[in-house]
Curated annotation (Swiss-Prot):
One of its GO terms (molecular function) is 3-phosphoshikimate 1-carboxyvinyltransferase activity. The keyword Transcription regulation does not apply. The active site is at 329 (proton acceptor). This is 3-phosphoshikimate 1-carboxyvinyltransferase. CDD domains: EPSP_synthase. It comes from Parvibaculum lavamentivorans (strain DS-1 / DSM 13023 / NCIMB 13966). It is found in: Cytoplasm. Pathway: Metabolic intermediate biosynthesis; chorismate biosynthesis; chorismate from D-erythrose 4-phosphate and phosphoenolpyruvate: step 6/7. The keyword Transferase applies. GO terms for cellular component: cytoplasm. InterPro entries: Enolpyruvate_Tfrase_dom, Enolpyruvate_Tfrase_sf, EPSP_synthase, EPSP_synthase_CS, RNA3'P_cycl/enolpyr_Trfase_a/b. Belongs to the EPSP synthase family. Catalyzes the transfer of the enolpyruvyl moiety of phosphoenolpyruvate (PEP) to the 5-hydroxyl of shikimate-3-phosphate (S3P) to produce enolpyruvyl shikimate-3-phosphate and inorganic phosphate. GO terms for biological process: amino acid biosynthetic process; aromatic amino acid family biosynthetic process; chorismate biosynthetic process.
Length: 451
């Protein structure tokens, strides 16, 4: 659905730009930032965090950890410290926990609170309050927690944790790192072993970080391709020093912009290429994208690398549905790349996008059509008809309060024949506070009040 043509106070227009050139560092990984604060709050002692993403979502989690009893402080050098209260030591908050737009923060903290004998009310913005929480509520109820929520398990909801949390064995009905992590967080304060069984691998930042903080966690290959994760409850978590690598989901926007804008060559330094997060980059290379992986290393248990990206002629492909979990947040910007490719790009098995910050399939398809690109939408995916580098642009796109929709179509505007306007760019601050400044530094042109 296109927005009205008059610009709102937070609208932003991306104009066709010259070559994007330079080296950038994107903000710290959002998934790892949330978890660093949460596990720091559960450790005994001081955890130091460098590179924390200071977007609105992560800052909401930091404030939540304070309300649950941890001391969380930002220092002048940009590092953060968390003085934890230990597993089982959370205090009951004296006011609602406000997660803003952050589904990750809300779901992880539900798991955390479910394992403690306290009551907390969870609230969020209009977008988060539309998102279903039932898939988290179901397993946490098995641990002994109780919930009072709006219809469909939506926020605001009140959660009372178990007086004595039960260790459970839970098989994930759909691939979801958030549900997996919520169950493991609840299991931390349960006696015995909590087991999670996955049919499809999902991002494993929680498992990696639990190990780093000293928890006993085992990950094994089970029968018929299943993955079995076992966590021994009631550990004493030890504080850590964590360096948060760059977020591959944020890096996706400058990377795709450089691929699509003629003459571009950029380097993105220090992003995590965790195999459960790198699906977009694999896909772009299969499409013919000139992406060189350099300086591979490991930092804080996470694989990290630099990327050199050069403008490329892309071709359409069929994205394997099994890859969806490793790139679920990147489909909107992949659809932009597909619009400039030669031939069709088929993206199926992504029904999960219907219940993100917006219905991302519908929002992406609508934005593509508004800019002259043909797209065929189905219940669980879309097929984009590429225009071989000749995307008309000129459209006004409704973002539906979704940061990834906003950034994706701003990327389109840099490479299209005419400018592209998004109706609301304010929410970009939830995940990528310096998006416009960083992109301008590479040569991108943006016009509008939302900066």
């Amino acid at each position: 659905m296109a927005s009205p043509s008059n610009h709102s106070a937070s609208s932003l227009t991306a104009e066709p730009s010259g070559a994007l050139l330079g080296s950038i560092t994107v903000p710290g990984d959002k998934s790892i930032s949330h978890r660093a604060l949460i596990f720091g709050a559960l450790a005994v002692g001081e955890t130091r965090i460098g590179g924390l993403l200071e977007g609105e979502d992560v800052l909401a989690t930091a404030e939540t950890m304070r309300r649950l009893g941890a001391e969380v402080e930002r220092h002048a050098d940009g590092t953060w410290s968390v003085h934890g209260v230990g597993v089982g030591g959370l205090k009951e908050p004296d006011q609602p926990l406000d997660f803003g737009n952050s589904g990750t923060g809300a779901r992880l903290v539900m798991g955390l609170v479910a394992g403690h004998p306290i009551t907390a009310t969870f609230i969020g913005d209009a977008s988060l309050s539309r998102r279903p929480m039932g898939r988290v509520i179901a397993p946490l109820t098995e641990t002994g927690a109780t919930f009072h929520a709006r219809e469909g398990g939506r926020l605001p909801l009140t959660l009372t944790g178990a007086g004595r949390a039960l260790p459970i064995t839970y098989r994930l009905p759909v691939a979801s790192a958030q549900v997996k992590s919520a169950v493991l967080l609840a299991g931390l304060n349960a006696p015995g072993v909590t087991t999670v069984i996955e049919e499809t691998p999902t991002r494993d930042h929680t498992e990696r970080m639990l190990r780093a903080f000293g928890a006993h966690i085992e990950v094994e290959d089970g029968p018929r391709g299943l993955i079995v994760i076992r966590l021994t409850g009631e550990p004493e978590l030890k504080p850590c020093r964590i360096s948060v690598p760059g977020d591959p989901s944020s890096a996706a926007f400058p990377v795709v912009a450089a691929l699509l804008t003629p003459g571009s060559e950029i380097t993105v330094t220090g992003i995590t290429l965790n195999p459960h997060r790198a699906g977009l980059y694999t896909t772009l290379m299969e499409m013919g994208g000139d992406i060189e992986v350099m300086n591979q290393r490991e930092e804080g248990g996470e694989p990290v690398a630099d990327l050199r990206v050069r403008a490329s002629r892309l071709k359409g492909i069929e994205v394997p549905p099994a890859r969806a979990a490793s790139m679920i947040d990147e489909y909107p910007v992949l659809a932009i790349a597909a619009a400039f490719a030669e031939g069709e790009t088929r993206m199926l098995g992504i029904h999960e996008l219907r219940v993100k910050e917006s219905d991302r399939i519908a929002a992406t398809a609508s934005g593509l059509r508004a800019n002259g690109v043909k797209v065929h939408e189905s219940d669980d995916g879309m097929v984009v008809e590429g225009r071989s580098g000749e995307v008309g642009g000129g459209g006004h796109v409704a973002t539906h309060i979704d940061h990834r929709i906003a950034m994706s179509f701003l990327v389109m505007g840099l490479a299209a024949q005419k400018p592209v306007t998004v109706d609301d760019a304010a929410m970009i601050a939830t995940s990528f506070p310096n998006f416009t400044g960083l992109m301008r530094g590479l040569g991108a042109s943006f016009v509008g009040r939302a900066q």
